[in-house]
Amino acid sequence: MAAPCVRLGSVRCTGTLLRYFCGSARHQAAAASHEEIDIPRRKSWDKTAVLQALAYTVSHDPTAAHYMFQDDPFLVPKTSSEFRLYSLSKESGRNAAKYIIGTHPKLFQNDIAEPHIPCLMPENFQPQIEGVSEEALKERIQLRRIKESIDLFDQLLQGGTAPSLETTNRLLDLICFYGDREPTRDIQTSEQNQQDDQDQQETEDSKKRPGQYRKASEILGSWRENNNAERIFNLMPERNAHSFCTLIQGMVKYGSSNKAFNTYTDLMNNRLTADVQTFNALILAAPDMKEKYNEKWDLIVELLKHMVQQNVRPNLLTFNSVLKSLRKCGTMARGLALQTINEMKALNIEPSLGTYNHLLGVFYKGALSPRGQTEILSEVLDEIEGRSFTLRDPDDVYFFTNAMRVCLDLKDIELAYRLHALQQTADNRGLMGDFYLQSTYYGRFFNLLCMMENIDVILKWYRELIPSLYYPNSRGMLDLLQALDMDNCLDLIPQIWKDIKQIGHSNKVELVEEVLKLMARDVQPAELQAAFADTALDIKSLYEVRDRVRIVLEWSSASLGNISVLLARAGRTEEAWKMLQRFKTNHRVPSTEVVDEFLSRAKMDANTNLAISLVQLAVGFSLPNTGKLAERVMEEFNVSEEQRLTLEDLQKSHSSSSSSSESSDSDRE
């Protein structure tokens, strides 16, 4: 489908734009050379400059919790779920306090601060101006009361008093920003809006395939057909460029790209000029208007040429929008992305971390990307290493997480160290994003460490990152266990198991069975074998029903066998035999290796009765090695004549049961 805007012909590259913008930049540089330099008589410091200077004198404490929590062992989270619960609880309490103060401001008028501190006093969120007037409309717009503002606007029109263009534009700004919905900060939301949203969501969900990724517009909510923003825009007797630009940006934000370009066409037909924010929004929406990659790029270039015609100077977000759209243009986007970066440099626009994040997205599509294309991260780090960044684009917070993903897929630990050093430079750690992005970054970093480094380095980072910066998931702990296995440091497993319990992963079956498997695989020295047995008993308690325990693990043959073997090797024969009895109660069958391990223990203890009991147990489970087991007992143990007869009877009963089962199988055939 052709874009509903004026076409200016096909464009091979953006060289014309580069020459235009470079000329503009040279003109500004020449004008700046004639300006007088004004040296300030004193240095103006930020209000928090002293605190920042003090913060730089203190290094990170790996044992400290996040600053948002109380310095109390009971109130410090130990798991990722507790971190989320505690942080949400604290934020919920803060919001509840704000709601109470905002709802009943008259109850909080006691001002004890000297001098007066306005931010400590409650804000008045209730309308003070009664009646139908433009001043009342302005007040409700200021209070972000969308439904009341729309009702008051309609009443003014019905009374024959049209609000001014400035007031109407402010109302349009409010409606387009929130997508014709009440702001989420309001506790009490319009029931009608909730019902409309629910009905529309059910319609969208019925059309959506299971497992399909959701767009940002789907998370925010879609642009509803003939909503109040469009209605008010059509009722406006006079419209200026601000009116059109606001409507276009709202349509793009809530996923109505086609309507946005139609409105942009109307703007140009009215001989008005769009601002840079509107062009940025249209560039982001351009890939949704076309199917082929080259057509998407042609539409982006066309919008850039419109900016040249209308003398609209691009900013950082303009180029970041171009790069973000190029991520949807396939392999042809790589050369175009480099051209975009060159134009930024020609305009003296400093790239942000979001710029480099989009560049990585263009060049790196996954672990199967050619090596030559993935070296772009090394070149990016060469350029930005050692520099301090500030937040200039909302997408800046995705750089570190996505760059660490590239390092993990490439299995390049040196690149990861360089990236982490950049993250530790100055205040760059403040650009890590929310808790989820931070956890993803550190999780990928720790995963790469477990794959590529020796155990000493891994444990150094383990103590530094966990749990002050990172709460590992079960996958991260499995990686650590595999690293311990690779470096033959299984003696650390009891301590690691305590950490697994502390961070809340003791209910993960895969992780628990991996711990048991590593401990039971080889015979260890007596002291370590005793520690393994204590750990096995601790794990055994997780399978038992107890009060106030919601999740109880289910016994498997592997877990029963490994715990039995660990107890037997530590000389705890009675406890090991009790574990062996659990096979029958839990309808599990022990492996031949478990029975052989018990027989070896019985031989060490010269316990003939235990050996005979093992043969009886093997007969009960119809194990295939029962005959050999009985022969081994008669050869290796001092058995009495009565015991020998018992063993021979067990052999015969096992042979007869085996032959009967074979004959029944042949009859079925």
Swiss-Prot record:
GO biological process: mitochondrial translation; regulation of translation
Biased composition (Low complexity): 653-663
One family name in Pfam for this protein: PPR_3
Keyword Repeat on entry: yes
Transmembrane segments: none
GO molecular function, one term: ribosomal small subunit binding
Chief localisation class: mitochondrion
Keyword Repeat among UniProt keywords: yes
PANTHER family hit by this protein: PENTATRICOPEPTIDE REPEAT DOMAIN-CONTAINING PROTEIN 3, SMALL RIBOSOMAL SUBUNIT PROTEIN MS39
Protein name stated in the entry: Small ribosomal subunit protein mS39
Organism for this UniProt entry: Xenopus laevis
